[in-house]
């Protein structure tokens, strides 16, 4: 559907911007409350759209705890972004001029949907360079961000990190 977008790379952002410029949507649903989904929600709001974020967990940004996420929730709501937590999207149907987004606990109508869920790190270049990646595709680094190649350091969204509190690996 031309009103439903994924968000994984720069060309995806161009398609979203072109749709907004050419169709003047009034509302959007962002599916997924990770870093990318939240950033997109803020940008859509800044562009003048009514924005709803739907997140399956009880808080946005899975890598932070619930208490810290509360500040993010307050910031988003203060800026007019609606949050629907602990609910997921079951279906998206095009009813002509609007999209109907069916949730587990209700329905929403909007002009466009951004899918920002299940994003895998873009580590193709790292793999081609022979760097070690974990089972989820994130670039493995040590506590100094050094990769498996002693001459290459890595930072950014595609890098495995160690949670300073729990010691668990993530990205």
PLM feature spans:
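Conserved catalytic/dimer-interface elements of ABC ATPase nucleotide-binding domains
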Residues: 29, 84, 153
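FAD-site-proximal beta/loop scaffold in flavoenzymes
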Residues: 2-21, 100, 107-171
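Short hydrophobic/aromatic-rich motifs at helix boundaries and adjacent loops
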Residues: 43-46, 95-96, 153-158
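A Rossmann-like FAD-binding core segment of flavoenzymes
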Residues: 46-143
């Amino acid at each position: 559907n031309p009103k439903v977008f994924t968000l994984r790379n720069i060309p995806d952002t161009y398609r979203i911007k072109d749709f907004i410029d050419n169709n003047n949507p009034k509302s959007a649903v962002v599916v997924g409350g990770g870093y990318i989904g939240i950033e997109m929600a803020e940008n859509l709001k800044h562009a003048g759209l009514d924005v709803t974020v739907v997140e399956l967990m009880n808080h946005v940004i899975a890598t932070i705890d619930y208490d810290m996420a509360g500040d993010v929730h307050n910031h988003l709501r203060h800026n007019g972004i609606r949050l629907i937590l602990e609910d997921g999207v079951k279906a998206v149907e095009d009813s002509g001029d609007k999209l109907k987004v069916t949730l587990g606990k209700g329905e929403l109508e909007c002009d466009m949907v951004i899918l920002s869920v299940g994003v895998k790190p873009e580590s193709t270049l790292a793999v081609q360079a022979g760097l070690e990646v974990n089972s989820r595709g994130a670039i493995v680094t040590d506590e100094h961000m050094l990769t498996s190649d002693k001459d290459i350091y890595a930072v950014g969204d595609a890098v495995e990190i160690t949670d300073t509190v729990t010691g668990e690996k993530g990205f």
